[in-house]
Amino acid sequence: MSTTSEIRRTFLDFFVKNGHQEVASSPLVPLNDPTLMFTNAGMVQFKNVFTGAETRPYHRATTSQKCVRAGGKHNDLDNVGYTARHHTFFEMLGNFSFGDYFKEQAIDFAWRLITEEYALPKDRLLVTVHTSDEDAAGLWRKVAGLPDERIIRIPTNDNFWAMGDTGPCGPCSEIFFDHGPKVAGGPPGSADENGDRFIEIWNLVFMQFEQLTVDQRVALPRPSIDTGMGLERVAAVLQGKHDNYDIDLMRALIEAIASAAGTDPDGPHKVSHRVIADHLRSACFLIADGVLPSNEGRGYVLRRIMRRAMRHAHMMGCVDPLMFKLVPALNREMADQFPELNRANALITETLKLEETRFKQMLDRGLKLLAEETGDLASGDSLPGPVAFKLYDTYGFPLDLTQDALRPRGIGVDTAGFDAAMARQREDARKSWTGSGDHATEAVWFDIRDRVGASEFLGYTSTDAEGAIVALVVDGKVVESAPADTEVAVIANQTPFYGESGGQMGDAGEIRLAEGGKVVVRDTAKKLGALHVHIGRVEGATIRVGQAARFVVDTERRDALRSHHSATHLLHEALRRRLGEHVTQKGSLVAPDRLRFDISHPKPLSAAEIRVVEDDVNREIRANAEITTQIMDPDSAIEAGAMALFGEKYGEEVRVVSMGRREPGANRPFSVELCGGTHARRTGDIGFFKIIGEGAVASGVRRIEAVTGQAAFEHIEAQDDLVSGAAQLLKVTPADLPGRIQALLDDRRRLERDLADARRKLATGGGGAAAPAVVEINGVKWVGRLLEDVPAKDLKGMVDEVKKQLGSGVVALIAVADGKASLVVGVTEDLVGRFDAVALVRAGAGAIGGKGGGGRPDMAQAGGPDGAQAGAALAAIEAALAG
């Protein structure tokens, strides 16, 4: 029996042997395609090749593409675990021809692979073709010798593939394996085609048309091939299994789950083992590709997947986090093919552990509410939609998790009511949102761009240039002129002013009008990716469309921005080298006085890590290496080692910024990134780099704040002033300051202990203090005492001391501080049957304005805002004892 890994390798090697380029799987976050949430097919990374928008140095390719289908059109999440073949994560084996071979060779390759390399019996194979595709039917007869009864014609779109409403498209031919008459189900196209007897293992797409409009389709001059074979499906067939979860790879994960959880993988929690095995793969690969759990977008889908798996772990009785313990098992099975799992191992492990810890807290609250709301519901009933929405909105309980939790009891969910509650909340939010006003002028920017075209940016080589005013906007409206003292947005045909984008703030400066007067520019924005919009105030004259002007950037501010931007690149690379390649940019701000950089990392940076990252950056700064830029196409840039941001859409050309030393044996300088911002000329121009802050901004996302150049110098001066000032106050040298502070802290802790001990003695009558007055009520010893300025946290210990002295009795101590009262009542063990400390403390709480009180029968506490009534509270407790 071949393993799943061997089946994958056989496929790839077969096509390499037949002239195909083996191409690595693209990330699950599609590069350069923000229209897709996740990569869901092998052809995604070749989409632009098929459309002709991109060329590759090969015309044939083969891949094993990692895919996720969970959300949107392709959503298998709800079925995972309950069926034999649904997955959120799967591998798609594929071979592709870009205008090279077509139907006959594609069919020949497919037939030879499955019958010779995989040795599947020919008499158990059948195919489908589109009704209109007689070419394919004839080729299956010619190449494979298939009789007509095993070539099934399908008239529906199941056998016709299209990239979208327009673009490349064509008929499909699917290959099916027959498990035999002992398995229920009919052939494709029959009434019972959804049975398990006939299983699709490969889909061949013949891209031979281009859809121009709904009604117009023309032949492509260079038809292409796109095929997809589900690795898990073909592995099940080759290993003699009817269920994808029984193949060796999935079984290894399921056994690891059972071992870690102490459960039977084939027992009552069989479905849960399958869910966790599938979702573990999705979660780990998504994290490795830069997605982190959050409440929106891809991060929200990841969180749903993770929490569904964690819910099933809870159902299996797992008290402690489970999923992070399974990462080594996944790495053993898949890291050889996908080394990113090893590179991101620390991030994956920490993210899973942190998310599961948080989820368990949420789950306990949510399940308690769910149990309360469904206590009277029986099988066949439905949970009201507003209740399901409350679980989601208040407790973070996704709808699918609620449905999953109720499924074993046969209880449904009113999804229409849930959707209505969601819609009401969104409408309320929309009505309460006043907005920034930008939406009111968006049409204006489109109109200007269509009329005057894009602004030409001159700022990479100049900070002072001539230009012409081509448009003016005042209060969201296009105008022909603007008088002095008017706030205005100015668009020119060309400008050296950088418009805010990529995290870098826009330039400031002046627009000096040829006819006198100027615009003091406080900021520059970039609209629609094309217009550089100078925002400022007109001074000294009227500005008019058509005027010539001189555009002068504030060079001191620009230099500070360039310094911080270049330092951000060096910081990014230093973090990846020191913390791991899982570190990716999650956000940034480049300002004149600081930089802010958000990264994917599961835990705080230690002081040692911060120091070594600073040292790495400053080492590159001291090297004073040249910072270079180069214009390249995106694929060439990435192949050359440039870092690109996941999901970022790049044009046909990108700007590659390289900086730092080229170390011996390295094929690139220290940092190489795709970037459109402005940068220093040499690393030495940055001056000095200092990290001034590090903290969390979201789960798995850390924020680093740093300064460079003059800002770094000013920060160090300020820190030096603080240290010198503190040393003067304590009358020590700066070098002796840490020791002096530690001595003061030690003295404070000692004095706090002494004070607490003195208060305790005061309450109990020790240390020369008068013994507490003991009164007997109904044969029970009673001590009630008012204490001034005693911390509430000390009262319990004092009550315990008095209880010990009494041996048997009831104690009530009230501390009054800042006008507020804190009350603690204690009852010795022998009297708990007669008196309840909770009832007694509640009797006294009312007098001091408290609401209730709580604790145990032997010790309870309460508080209230009216410390002046402390005596009345003690009297109320005495009355309760006497009653």
Swiss-Prot record:
HAMAP family referenced in this protein's UniProt entry, alphabetically: Ala_tRNA_synth_B
Taxonomic lineage from the root: Bacteria, Pseudomonadati, Pseudomonadota, Alphaproteobacteria, Rhodospirillales
Cellular component terms per the entry's GO annotation: cytosol
Family the entry assigns: Belongs to the class-II aminoacyl-tRNA synthetase family.
PANTHER family, alphabetized: ALANINE--TRNA LIGASE, CYTOPLASMIC (PTHR11777:SF9), ALANYL-TRNA SYNTHETASE (PTHR11777)
Subcellular localization, as worded in the UniProt entry: Cytoplasm
GO MF term (any one): ATP binding
Source organism (scientific name): Rhodospirillum rubrum (strain ATCC 11170 / ATH 1.1.1 / DSM 467 / LMG 4362 / NCIMB 8255 / S1)
Cofactor: Zn(2+)
GN (gene name): alaS
Protein name from the UniProt record: Alanine--tRNA ligase
